[in-house]
């Protein structure tokens, strides 16, 4: 059976992983692999029918099923990649154990724990727990045979995920992050959120959304922005938003400190140049500034600053990144006023590749307090 996917969007990897797992369990219980499975996405509250490519028994207590990722009309490197789930029932106490197999990334900051994040975990538990009786344990191993290869074409390593892809996302619907035709959809979401709140949180990508939720931002105050920060700043001011808290990866938000308001690297970069300029202003010794400028990435530059901070007992990270966060605020407010003559207060919260906060601006802290956020110490 075909999958019910709109012309504009498909489904995220967690949906296909869950569908494979459901099909594998059904194969194990009935000795027949279904042609498709229908599952609840939870986010949003709708169902999806996912085609099952194949499935097979691997013994009396084990089975395997396979789907293929279909992200819709997105420029997504996971298109058509196989998603396997192997399941096994063992004696137990009604538990569900979810494991990452080959091609599922490992989180360096969590001792190699599989990069299967909260939405994927929730989706799997919602659909698989009903199959488990009180004297059983269900073991589910998720496998992306091409995951290790595909991961070399992503920025996963910058976020501390190695050897494969993440099952990341806050929704079952896959939306392109950088396709221009999606800007109108983001603006529509922004307009809807602005009708309820004068303070919103702009979240860059899925990591920003996931952390916003973890740190206590109400769902109806989150707006996903992708790379169109400039356009969405102006749109927010035009519909009456008073305050925006930016929540994003430092390697993206650093561009705003340099006056770059479309953050896709194909259009503009300059990240290391901006970082070194901030370092000079903070008083970093010139030989270290030169070394910083040779870092391959901003994440590597941040690690150098942390090393020198420990070595010299000087708070280089907070000095440089606090000033940078405040500069992001100022340049953003100036941009909005220059383009639209509207006043908009901006705060910023930058996180690193380990998804930990690096710096929060003065205005950002005030907004976070107002929102009731609980943020780990920087």
UniProtKB/Swiss-Prot annotation:
One of its GO terms (biological process) is anaerobic cobalamin biosynthetic process. It catalyses: Co-precorrin-5B + S-adenosyl-L-methionine = Co-precorrin-6A + S-adenosyl-L-homocysteine. Pathway: Cofactor biosynthesis; adenosylcobalamin biosynthesis; cob(II)yrinate a,c-diamide from sirohydrochlorin (anaerobic route): step 6/10. Coiled coil: none annotated. Disulfide bonds: none annotated. It is an enzyme of class 2 (transferase). The keyword Transcription does not apply. It holds the Pfam family CbiD. One of its GO terms (molecular function) is cobalt-precorrin-5B C1-methyltransferase activity. Keywords: Cobalamin biosynthesis, Methyltransferase, S-adenosyl-L-methionine, Transferase. Its EC number is 2.1.1.195. Belongs to the CbiD family. This is Cobalt-precorrin-5B C(1)-methyltransferase. It comes from Synechocystis sp. (strain ATCC 27184 / PCC 6803 / Kazusa). The gene is cbiD.
């Amino acid at each position: 059976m075909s999958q019910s996917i709109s012309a504009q969007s498909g489904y995220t990897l967690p949906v296909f992983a869950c569908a494979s797992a459901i099909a594998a369990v059904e194969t194990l219980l009935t000795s027949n692999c279904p042609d498709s499975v229908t599952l609840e996405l939870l986010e949003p509250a709708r169902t999806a029918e996912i085609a099952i490519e194949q499935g097979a028994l691997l013994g009396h207590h084990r089975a395997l099923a396979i789907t293929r990722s279909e992200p819709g009309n997105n420029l997504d490197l996971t298109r058509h990649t196989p998603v396997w789930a192997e399941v096994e029932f063992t004696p137990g106490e009604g538990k569900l154990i979810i494991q990452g197999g080959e091609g599922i990334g490992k989180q360096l900051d969590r001792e190699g724990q599989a990069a299967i994040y909260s939405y994927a975990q929730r989706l799997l538990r919602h659909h698989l727990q009903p199959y488990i009786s009180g004297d059983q344990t269900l073991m589910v191993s998720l496998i992306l045979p091409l995951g290790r290869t595909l991961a070399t074409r992503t920025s996963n390593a910058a976020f501390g995920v190695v050897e494969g892809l993440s099952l990341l996302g806050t929704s079952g619907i896959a939306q392109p992050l950088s396709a221009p035709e999606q800007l109108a959809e983001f603006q529509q979401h922004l307009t809807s959120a602005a009708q309820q709140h004068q303070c919103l949180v702009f979240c860059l990508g899925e990591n920003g959304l996931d952390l916003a939720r973890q740190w206590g931002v109400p769902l109806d105050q989150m707006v996903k922005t992708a790379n169109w920060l400039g356009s969405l700043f102006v749109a927010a001011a035009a519909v009456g938003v008073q305050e925006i808290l930016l929540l994003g990866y430092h390697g993206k938000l650093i561009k705003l400190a340099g006056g770059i308001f479309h953050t896709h690297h194909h259009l503009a970069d300059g990240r290391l140049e901006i970082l070194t300029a901030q370092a000079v202003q903070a008083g970093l010794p010139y030989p270290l500034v030169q070394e910083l400028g040779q870092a391959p990435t901003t994440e590597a530059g941040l690690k150098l600053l942390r090393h020198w901070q420990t070595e010299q007992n000087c708070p280089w990270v907070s000095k440089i990144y606090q000033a940078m966060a405040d500069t992001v605020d100022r340049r953003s407010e100036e941009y909005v006023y220059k383009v639209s003559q509207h006043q908009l207060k901006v705060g910023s919260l930058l996180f690193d590749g380990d998804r930990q906060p690096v710096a929060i601006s003065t205005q950002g802290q005030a907004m976070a307090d107002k929102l009731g956020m609980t943020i780990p110490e920087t």
